[in-house]
A protein has these predicted regions:
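Terminal catalytic/cofactor-binding subdomain
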Residues: 1-130, 137-141, 177
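Loop-rich catalytic cores of soluble enzymes, especially ATP-dependent carboxylate-amine ligases
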Residues: 5-10, 105, 116-135, 139, ...
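C-terminal active-site "lid" helix and adjoining low-complexity regulatory extension at the edge
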Residues: 641, 666-678, 692-696, 705-757
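Sequence termini and other peripheral, non-core segments
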Residues: 1-54, 329, 333-444, 473
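A short glycine-rich, hydrophobically flanked beta-strand micro-motif that places a catalytic Asp/Glu
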Residues: 97-102, 325-329, 568-572, 579, ...
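A long amphipathic alpha-helix within ATP-dependent nucleotide-binding catalytic cores
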Residues: 253-265, 307-310, 314, 560-564, ...
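ATP-binding N-terminal substructure of ATP-dependent carboxylate-amine bond-forming enzymes
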Residues: 422-488, 492-495, 514
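Active-site nucleotide/adenylate-binding loops and adjacent lid/helix of ATP-dependent enzymes
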Residues: 468-632, 680-681
């Protein structure tokens, strides 16, 4: 089969580049000094019997972080970033993730505990590995790179070739070619990407096989890494030969199980190798890669892209390697792994030739300038080893003082970075914060998540066979369809609540600006609220707390409201303090005092300067991707200033509170203060009743209450309902400006999956 010719003739270059990608990353949990910890796997991650993202490898201290498969490699790296951030923020304060592959700060072997898994056989298997290979070699960590050739490409290629009549046999032959050519040329990736030049002497036991001060390219990929006994040789001439030789060594007792055979390529798609002959290989797992200590998550996107196109090159090559070539590749692997990382490799000519073939392939399949630049940069590293990861690593180790010290330093640095925006997942920063918080908790607890539509905040969440859909963090099938429609229409909301016996302020509705302005005499001198009939998040609302006294100001407020809707309400202003109640089901989970947007004068700065200073708080942003919203100085704010006899250029006296908004929505720059524990229980019960009246499961209820410490009475002097909101914001409760955090996303998960342990 002439794969190159078929791709060129039938213009399959784009399809050839597609596939699915996944990454598994092993790392040790360590203390601040780089010593491997002996603590149990954190219970906050739930059970390892089902967790899809956060597992343990050999040891209880050895994390294994697993991304879901993605069609875009960039999405796989985003998931790796998110899982990493969740893990780092969930570890005890004193624990870190070691960023280097070779272990440092090893405890005596009898203190290293195999992963304590629920499946007894899994524990016994690890104990077997300890006896055969020793625990220290099992503590080596790395990256596993999973790649599935595009199914569509395989099917199209099968239809065009004439060598194979069976599609499964064809698929298996394609993956065997990929695996064997990879094993033949894997040394190239070791030269370019290896990062294990040394290890602490304790790793070797009594005597190190390396000379004092000797550096190598990759101890992990050398004979001193985790390798099987020399006599265990698996035949790669065909998949059938591969299966039979693997079964032979298991039957003879040389291997306890098929998975004990360690190879830098593992063919995946079935529990037993023999099943691959009938079912076909689904994807290949490449297990060669050292952790890149200069990448916070162990691998960069550029290197992941390079690996992808290197794998495509292994398919592109016309020759198909058999067992003899695989053995040659193993010899070259060990040779390059033990070379001095400061010197060019003895195999430079072959390495350059393969990457030049990659560049020719890129041109033929029109891969683009970006990946071409990445490959050219790698090609140049054959002539300059200092540009490789190892070249940079040697200098970094010298600067830090030791391998272990560098690892500890980077581990602390990467954990600090993960906490810089502790309220967000940096890889999914374009999603709203409530969805990011929910994603965090879903990853932490081990539920399968699929992002159906990132821009629309739509998730599919699965636990076992139980599937739920979530939009915007808390919109689910548990709410009636009619509920948000009722709450979106403020007139209907008030009528429904009034019929249910709840206190609501009087209001008048208008359908045009002129109609509303004509009724100005009815409201002159009265404290009123002007707002769109259908709104959420406080949009288009103006409040005249001291009474409206100017027709032009009234008109302007009416015009602002009409920008948000075709109908506008003018409502009596209720005296008291506004509180937001977050209700889920039959319980009020959180109560928040939202202080309207304000600044406090210092006698020096103007209002504008005070606003700029307050907006510099890192918690303030656009309000959907930050817990607090930056304060604006728009029309509504300037109207509010005018009521106080101020302008943006006024200089308030020291301690003077300047109100920039009358409404207290966080989405318009307000401050959030948790009042859950201070609020009288009677008001919490009222909020639950209001939610039930709306037919909702999740609701944000806004109540005006003059005195939160006194029990509710059945009149407007005691309390009144301002609004009921669908899809209420959760971030202001999770990350309040002041007070206790209420992790509402966890309550949403419990509502959706009550069976979750």
């Amino acid at each position: 089969m002439k794969l190159q010719q078929l791709i060129k003739t039938h213009q399959l270059g784009l399809l050839f580049q597609q596939g699915k990608f996944g990454i598994e990353k092993e790392s040790q949990r360590v203390d601040a000094n780089g010593n491997i910890v002996t603590t149990a796997h954190p219970a906050v991650f739930g059970s390892r019997s089902y967790h899809p993202y956060i597992q343990t490898d050999f040891a209880e201290s050895q994390l294994e972080l697993i991304t879901p498969p993605n069609e875009k490699l960039s999405d796989t790296l985003r998931w790796l970033s998110a899982i990493h951030e969740v893990t780092l923020r969930s570890l005890p304060e004193s624990e870190y993730i070691f960023p280097l592959s070779m272990p440092a700060g090893l405890s005596p072997e009898d203190q290293i505990q195999e992963a304590q898994l629920e499946n007894k056989w899994d524990v016994e298997y690890r104990e077997h590995l300890s006896k055969i290979y020793g625990k220290y070699k099992q503590m080596v960590s790395g990256i596993h790179y999973n790649f599935q050739i595009s199914d569509e490409f395989v099917e199209k290629l099968f239809s065009l070739q004439q060598t194979y009549s069976d599609p499964i046999e064809f698929r298996n032959a394609l993956y065997m070619k990929l695996a064997n050519n990879f094993l033949r040329y894997q040394w190239i990736l070791v030269y370019l990407l290896a990062a294990t030049p040394e290890v602490e002497s304790q790793y070797f036991g009594e005597k190190s096989p390396l000379a004092a001060g000797q550096l190598v390219r990759s101890l992990r990929s050398s004979p001193y890494g985790y390798v099987n006994a020399p006599h265990i040789v698996i035949n790669h001439d065909s998949l059938k030969d591969y299966v039979e030789s693997l079964e032979h060594f298991v039957a003879s007792g040389d291997l306890l199980a098929e998975k004990e055979f360690y190879s830098n390529v593992r063919l995946r798609g079935a529990k037993k190798a023999r099943e691959l002959l009938e079912k076909g290989v689904k994807y290949a797992e490449f297990r060669l890669f050292d952790l890149n200590p200069f990448a916070p998550y162990g691998i960069t996107l550029e290197d992941a892209q390079f690996i992808h196109y290197f794998l495509l090159t292994m398919l592109w090559l016309e020759e198909t390697s058999g067992q003899q070539a695989v053995e040659q590749g193993k010899a070259y692997l060990y040779q390059v792994a033990l070379e001095d990382p400061r010197a060019p490799t003895a195999l430079q000519t072959e390495g350059e030739a393969i990457l030049k073939t990659t560049l020719e392939m890129l041109e033929q399949i029109q891969a683009g300038k970006e990946i071409e630049a990445i490959v050219k940069a790698k090609l140049a590293q054959f002539a300059d080893p200092s540009k490789t990861i190892n070249g940079r690593l040697r200098q970094a180790i010298e600067k830090a003082g030791s391998y272990k010290a560098l690892g500890a330093q980077l581990a602390q640095q990467y954990k600090a970075q993960a906490f810089e925006r502790f309220y967000a997942l940096s890889a999914f920063d374009n999603m709203e914060l409530s969805t990011q918080a929910l994603l965090f908790d879903l990853i932490q607890k081990g539920l399968n998540v699929e992002i159906l539509d990132e821009n629309d905040q739509f998730l599919a969440v699965k636990f076992g066979d139980h599937l739920e859909y979530v939009k915007n963090g808390n919109m689910t099938s548990h709410d009636q369809y009619i509920s948000p429609l009722i709450m979106e229409n403020k007139v209907v909301t008030k009528k429904v609540l009034a019929k249910a016996g709840f206190n609501v302020p009087k209001s008048v509705e208008f359908t045009s600006v002129e109609q509303a302005v004509a009724h100005y005499p009815l409201f002159e001198g009265k404290a009123v609220v002007i707002k769109p009939k259908s709104t959420n998040y406080g949009l288009g609302i103006t409040i005249f707390q001291q009474g409206v006294t100017n027709r032009d100001d009234f008109r302007q407020a009416i015009e602002i409201a009409f920008r948000e809707d075709k109908e506008v309400m003018v409502e009596d202003y209720l005296v008291g303090t506004e509180y937001r109640f977050f209700v889920l089901g039959d319980e009020t989970l959180a109560v928040l005092l939202r202080v309207p947007a304000n600044v406090i004068g210092d006698g020096v700065k103007t209002v504008r300067e005070l606003v700029d200073a307050k907006n510099a708080d890192p918690l303030r942003g656009d309000g959907s991707r930050s817990p607090l919203k930056k304060i604006a100085l728009g029309e509504i704010e300037q109207l509010q200033l005018k009521e106080q006899g101020l302008t943006p250029e006024s200089v308030p006296t020291s301690g003077q509170i300047v109100q920039l908004r009358a409404n207290s929505n966080i989405s318009t720059g307000g401050d959030s203060i948790d009042m859950t524990d201070q609020m009288h229980e009677s008001y919490k019960a009222l909020a639950v009743g209001i939610t039930h009246a709306m037919g909702a499961k999740v609701c944000g209820v806004d109540l005006i209450i003059p005195d939160l410490s006194q029990p509710a009475r059945p009149n407007l002097d005691s309390w009144g309902v301002i609004e009921a909101n669908f899809n209420p914001m959760m971030m202001m409760h999770i990350f309040p400006y002041q007070g206790k955090s209420r992790r509402l996303t966890q309550n949403v998960i419990k509502m959706l999956f009550p069976e979750l342990p």
